[in-house]
Amino acid sequence: MGLHFYECNLSVQRKRVCSLEKRQMKAPKYQTAYACEGKKLTIECEPGDLINLIRANYGRFSITICNDHGNVEWSVNCMFPKSLTVLNSKCSHKQSCSVLAATSMFGDPCPGTHKYLEAHYQCISAAQTSTTTNRPSPPPWVLSNGPPIFGNGSGLIQAPPPPPPRLPSLPGVVGIHGINAVPPTHSTPSSSTATLPGGRLKGVTSATTKHPGGRHDGLPPPPQLHHHHHHTDETVPTKSSSSGSTGNVTSPSNTRILTGVGGAGSDDGTLLTTKSSPNRTPGTVASTTNSSLSIGGTGAGGVVRTINNINLNAAGMGTDDESKLFCGPTHARNLFWNMTRVGDVNVQPCPGGAAGIAKWRCVLMKRLPDAGYDEYDDDLPVASSTTPIPPSSAGDCLHNSSSCEPPVSMAHKVNQNQRLRNFEPTWHPLTPDLTQCRSLWLNSLEMRVNQRDSSLISIANDLSEVTSSKTLYGGDMLVTTKIIQTMSEKMLHDKETFPDQRQREAIIMELLHGVVKTGSNLLDESQLSSWLDLNPEDQMRVATSLLTGLEYNAFLLADTIIRERNVVQKVKNILLSVRVLETKTIHGSVVFPDSDQWPLSSDRIELPRSALIENSEGGLVRIVFAAFDRLESILKPSYDHFDLKSARSYVRNTAILSNDSDAATGDMQQRIRILNSKVISASLGKGRHIQLSHPITLVLKHLKTENVSNPTCVFWNYIDHAWSVNGCSLESTNRTHSVCSCNHLTNFAILMDVVDEHQHSLFTMFDGNMRIFIYISVAICVVFIIIALLTLKLFNGVFVKSARTSIYSSIYICLLAIELLFLLGIEQTETSIFCGFITIFLHCAILSGTAWFCYEAFHSYSTLTSDELLLEVDQTPKVNCYYLWSYGLSLTVVAISLAINPSTYTQNDYCVLMEANALFYATFVAPILIFFVAAIGYTFLSWIIMRRKSRTTLKTKEHTRLANVRFDIRCSFVFLLLLSAVWCCAYFYLRGAKLDEEVATVYGYCFICFNTMLGLYIFVFHCIQNEKIRREYRKYVRQHAWLPKCLRCSKTSISSGVVAGNGGPGVGNVANNSAGTLSKSKSKLPLSATDEARAVEQQQQQKDVPAADDAIIMGAGSDSELNEAQQRRTLKSGLLTGSLQPTPVGAVVLERGTLRSTGMASVGHASPTSSAGSTHLIFAHKQQQQLQQPGEAYYHQPDYYSWKHPQAGQREYYNNTGVTANAGIGGASPSQAHEVFYWTQKHNNQHGKKKRGGNAGAVPASPSGSLHSRVTAASQVLFYPSYKKTSGLKQPPATQAYPHYAEALDPPNAAYYQQQLQQQQLRQQRQQQQQQLSSDEEQAEQHAHLLHLQHQQRRAGGPQLPAPPPHMAQYQQELLAQQQRQQYRNKHSNCDLSQGMGLGKGMGMVLGDAYYNQGGSSNGGGDGGPVYEEILSNRNSDGQHYEVGDFDVDEVYNNSVGTGVFNSMRAAVAAGGNRYCGGSLSGGSVTSRNQQQQQKQKQPPRRCVADDDDDDDDDEYDDEVTAAEQLHDSVCDDEDNDSDIDDDTHGLPPQSDERMRRLMALQDEDFKRRFQRQQRKNGLPLDYGASAQTASINHPEHNGAVFGVSGGVGEGSMRGAYRQQQQQNAKSPSARLAVNELFGHGNAGPPLPPANQTPAQKRQQLQKLSPQSTTSSSSHTSHSNPQHAPAHHIQHQQHHQQQQQARHLSAMLDENNTVRCYLEPLAK
């Protein structure tokens, strides 16, 4: 059979020029010759061929060769090391030779053994011999993995094969004096010309064989096998094409990781893998021909056994048929193993002196690529060791039951070599399987022990002698342990034949001594190769049999002894102690062994006295102790699991060797667990696992103290033949010892993990890019978390101090700790002192962070199910509870974990995770899952409740709060999912990277992405999306000059208002200390809505306003910003520079946190807050008369003085009905005296909500809707003057309905200014009394108390306060007495303006029961002070607590108007009131709502309903009122009063916002009905749109228009109907203005008079406006000729502007959970 080769030449330019030339060559035959001792060995070749010796030995390796008589006593481990040298000197390169096999020629390596001479050789041609050195060459299949190539027609150049796999050494072998070193093999430097695939020469290189001389991975070295094998250095004949020099290349050995499935000796044909680290450098290729497993021996002359991995493939590389690959021939266990096809099992007879068969399997192993191996580099040699099959090998193929395949072309090989280039055949397992090989002499002993008359003592002695002197095989181990157990069973029956007790004890003791000696021999190092002949399952089975056999024989002796005695059997590897103790002599624990008995180890086992007493029998306790040496090398643990199922995979998972040439490879090694202590045993019953009530204590010394961790206490399970942890626990451990506690008795030891000697942190797993990305990701997240925390702390004035703010602060703190600890932990190694601390704190931080997320979801749920939806205030008790449960529970869990097993935090490979054990899942995974599921559950419930509420609530504050809660729930849910993704990716990445999984990289980059997104999410959705935070950022940036110029660029935005006043104890002082200016942008705030074209004109118009010269900007609006150029600017300077849009004089904007941030001196003053949007408080005092345009009546309200005394050239028209307002630039601007307060928010048009009254001719819409508007978002709170009711007799219709305007229309009356004069006199008296008070503190205290009483009196609806007493004491007593007489109505809200001051039924309705006006009768003693206490639905108010600042006492008692008209009104109003309130802020619960509905159902039907008069009906009114109608009205009045009393009796709770829609409808109906009745009583038309029948001068009585809360303008709406009436009578001075038209009174009729002036201001007005001066003018003149207005009116206006002071607006939360606001009194 011929082989085809290719000849390739390489040009000077290194271009490959190959000419294929087929030549035939006869492959040399591999031959073996033997010669017995005393005879000649003759070697002869054919003519033309020369002898090439491969290996030789003089001695004996086989018991069958040259043994005609079957002598089994000869040694089979006999070798003369210089046999090959002697034979080469006689036969090398000769055609024939003869050598005498005698001791005189070779020496006597083993006297007493019949020896033989064995030689392996080839007959090669003389031409081949001329190109090589005199070194012997190996067989052709050893020379190369590729076809031979002829260079230049001579010299055979072999294609260098890749390094074959490094076979792993046998694990767990530890010598008694340390680690056994492997004898190094010979290394020969040589040069070679490497040939690449395709015939291209790579160049001349040199390589030196290096064999391992030590271990660098911390594992035990390969075991020493006492087998004599031939050692030969295989050389490759090479020749350089350029220089012609030749050399021999000695192949290096490469050790690989053996991984795969299937146990040793298995025939399953499993594909295994091996890890290869080829030693390749550019331009240099080492020619490798074999892979060696070096096994040293302890006998004379150590040898090395070589395993040649040869791929016998006729086609070379390139075939897809794995059956074409072969394992090379080798020697192992005194047998020659010829080449075997992959997947086949080589079976042959056992070595000489043993019966049975031996087998060894050839498998295909995958070479795992590493850093030095390029899988796709075609310029490198093919990673295979396939060679063509020589013709002479056909017989070998047949001998191995395999067939030889025909050749295939080289081109096919090159195209197909990629598939199998990473695979190569390997013998598996590490050693042949000799389980069925049994020595002949052991068979003889087994037959003897089964005989009836055999002597057990003799058999035991023979067995101990044979095992100490003979080499055993795997089958011999099984037979030996079986004989030991058989002898114990037989002795159990034979001992009864010995009647004498002493004789019985002596015989059993002798038997026990032989058994112990035999067991020690089996554990000896010399028999380690016999253990390796067994597969792992059989090894565990033999070890279990040995332990049980020793225990059975020991208990034979213990049961024989009947008195207290201690028998100790001590041999080389076993210490056995049999103790029989009397219970009465046991005074403490029993300790084994004694310090002087077992010097090999300091292990100790301690049995408590209670455990011994419980297991006593007949007053005696029988104990068997045993300590073993070298048993730890046999009872190897399986990978990760200590049971029989995984024992099969131990070899492939634990035999890990690093490449000797590259000890610092970056490949991750798999987990290795070793037995790191001696095995110690204790038993109280033969073969029984006795459970003890009190555990025993074991102290075990570590065999290896470096690079080991995770000690685990285990015992040997006889049933599973594996180590188990059941019943044992680790008490404590240190570097050298571990203390264990077990509740049963058996064989104990310590298992530990092997750690790589080169400690690596977690970042060693990362590639360069991932390491950088992790740093960047963590840094980004940390920066954004810090920004969020600083935002919450620095801008705390923006936020409500609520539970949600505290929760998010805690979440940010926990996340910051997690990020920093993770960054520190991944840089630490397991040996670092900070490793355990970092893991502990990280555990606590993760648990706390997850708990806070759960509490955040719970808080959202509780907010939706309680009144907290409308009142988001500081909830300190609840937050403290969250703190306790979060941090307290986390610390408790971590403390429990530390108490159970502290080493859990230090046993993991890296310092960011706990060890994955039961404690990890119980204390880490379980709490996190509980918190996570709870958070998801509460979020789901919150979403359901929110959806249900959104369908049942009005578009009021509750609806807005629901929208805010909905947004918070969404953000929190996304936040929770994102954080869970971050932690899950981090966990799976760490676990995967630890096991070197490919998917770990994917998890790593997912962690980087999610962690970065987490930081961005925190910054965007928790900081940037909040409008107030954005505004604070802009302020902060523009106020700090150290920031970059690009960040502090100036922008323009709308002004949010200014503070009026020039100093004073109110807002003005604070305003003067504040900083910043405002500019204008497009906005919808209730300010001037002029366009840009009129900005300059209005700025010039504001120059002459004295009261605003020193006004300072109080705070920026939602879009306002502080100008960087002028950080402190007054209103006047802002108007002059053009950066400030003119605004109403005296308007104040109090924004969220403004007062707090500007250092308000008043305690507790803070502006209302909101979770979204901006809230503004407008203080429209002394508002300037602006140019009025259509749609601006809401903002620019005409004032009383400008109406009464118009400026020259100025005419006032209302509702744009032919009258213009023309204020000259230089003229004094009129001002309005009454005050308007309201909260409002800038309108959002994109919500698609209809603006009320936006059509032409109607009242323009407010920016954000008005009171209880049904078509707009009711988002404002109004504070307006609620005029006190007046009671008295019914006046004739001719009486003036507007007494305030009467003095202007009819100067002789001057009722208003006469009242002012009376109030001034009373005020002077009061000042004299106040001066007698001791101090200002007492004044403030008494005043506050009196004001509180007056406030309760006003809300209780009782009678009016009496006239002021002469001194304060009497005044206070009378107030207290009157308070006791009043009946407090608990259902009052702050908007209950229609409640009567008295509840008596005897007083009828006079002039309307709900009309409010200022002042009372002269003798009624009622107060006329303004009360600013109306708060309606404000969807942004969070209901903070405010300090109370009420009015001055003087103002309360001097602010009455004594007219008979209002005396009669007081009596009329006292009889009834409005039943409903539309402005309650009380959220109300479900129970209260149900009660209210039930109570309403129980109410009888009302007989008094509103008349169905159409608002648009223009029929004339019949002046005659029938008696039936009057009776009907009287009955209705009584019914109304009765219903009010019924409400008081039942104690109805405050109305809830959920009933707002129904209440508003009922209010409209009730108001309409009352209005119609009042019209009948006053003789006025019932139709709203009817024109007034009275003259312009003789004003009719007030029509009793009530305050309606309806916001509609259509039919049924009081406001809409009355607006029509006002529009039709705009020029009529008799037009009436109800309080509900406070913000729309510019459309018709004159404005309200000054109702809020203090006595000082009123006295000034009286001085300026005397009755004599006012007499000269008339109402007609005032209206028709404004140019003739008296000068003192203008002077009074200017003086009034200069003296006006800004005041605080305070609020408090009353007993009905209603926020009530008050105006601060002016300074005395």
Curated annotation (Swiss-Prot):
Site residues, Cleavage: 745-746
- What SUPFAM superfamilies has UniProt attached to this entry? Family A G protein-coupled receptor-like
Q: Which residues lie on this side of the membrane: Cytoplasmic?
A: 793-805, 854-879, 946-972, 1022-1724
**Which residue ranges does the record assign to the GAIN-B domain?**
565-758
In its UniProt record, which GO terms are filed under biological process? adult locomotory behavior; cell surface receptor signaling pathway; proprioception
Top-level taxon in the UniProt lineage: Eukaryota
Looking at the record, the residues that make up the SUEL-type lectin domain are 35-124
Residues annotated with Phosphoserine modification = 1167, 1262, 1269, 1334-1335
The protein's PTM annotation reads: Proteolytically cleaved into 2 subunits, an extracellular subunit and a seven-transmembrane subunit.
Positions bearing carbohydrate: 9, 152, 248, 290, 338, 400, 659, 707, 734
Membrane-side (Extracellular) residue stretches:
1-771, 827-832, 901-924, 994-1000
Claim: Transmembrane is one of the keywords in the record: yes
Q: Molecular function terms in GO for this entry?
A: carbohydrate binding; G protein-coupled receptor activity; mechanoreceptor activity
> Cystine bridges: which residues?
713-740, 728-742
Q: Tell me what this protein is called.
A: Latrophilin Cirl
Which species is the source of this protein? Drosophila virilis
- Supply the source organism's classification: Eukaryota, Metazoa, Ecdysozoa, Arthropoda, Hexapoda
